[in-house]
């Protein structure tokens, strides 16, 4: 059975930690859709289209990875795509508690969707898009935390907001 795996997130912006999980997932599963969420309840720095383009740019060399934006419930997107696996990253016990609650809800809404949790590589365990955005918006360097094309996009976005 072919496994279609979703890796959902806001990716505002995509970080080296996200990319690490995508690459590791791509080596374990047949097909990965990086599902970039519209997340209207979050005030994002980048638009949905910009985030999709940034993720596409940094995953273009991964032949079994596809990138799509979506709005609405993740489980509805999973049903539409006929996904049967969901990959989520866990950095901390707080992430675990949050993800455990989400997974319980997903099971009620779509019992056939299994969740797989991956822990980050050690060098990315502290990393989050929120931290990257905050550092970038305050003029700090984030080049060690994001792919170079994302770093440039952040610089451009911050410069245009001044």
Swiss-Prot record:
ATP binds at residues 10-11, 18, 89-91, 99, 124-130. Homohexamer. Substrate binds at residues 10, 42, 74, 88. Pathway: Cofactor biosynthesis; coenzyme A biosynthesis; CoA from (R)-pantothenate: step 4/5. GO terms for cellular component: cytoplasm. It is found in: Cytoplasm. Reversibly transfers an adenylyl group from ATP to 4'-phosphopantetheine, yielding dephospho-CoA (dPCoA) and pyrophosphate. This is Phosphopantetheine adenylyltransferase. Keywords: ATP-binding, Coenzyme A biosynthesis, Cytoplasm, Magnesium, Nucleotide-binding, Nucleotidyltransferase, Transferase. It comes from the Bacteria. GO terms for biological process: coenzyme A biosynthetic process. The gene is coaD. NCBIfam families: coaD_prev_kdtB, cyt_tran_rel.
């Amino acid at each position: 059975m072919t496994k279609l795996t979703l890796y959902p997130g806001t990716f505002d912006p995509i970080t080296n930690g996200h990319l690490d999980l995508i690459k590791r997932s791509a080596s374990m599963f047949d097909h990965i859709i990086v599902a970039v969420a519209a997340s209207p309840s979050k005030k994002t720095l980048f638009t949905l289209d910009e985030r999709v383009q940034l993720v596409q740019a940094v995953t273009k060399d991964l032949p079994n990875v596809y990138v799509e934006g979506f709005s609405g419930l993740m489980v509805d997107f999973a049903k539409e795509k006929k996904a049967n696996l969901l990959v989520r990253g866990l950095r901390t016990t707080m992430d675990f508690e949050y993800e455990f609650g989400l997974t319980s809800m997903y099971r009620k809404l779509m019992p056939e969707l299994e969740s797989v949790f991956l822990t980050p590589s050690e060098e990315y365990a502290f990393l989050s898009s929120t931290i990257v955005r905050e550092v970038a918006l305050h003029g700090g360097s984030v080049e060690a935390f994001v792919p170079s094309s994302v770093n440039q996009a952040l610089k451009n976005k911050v410069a245009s907001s001044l």
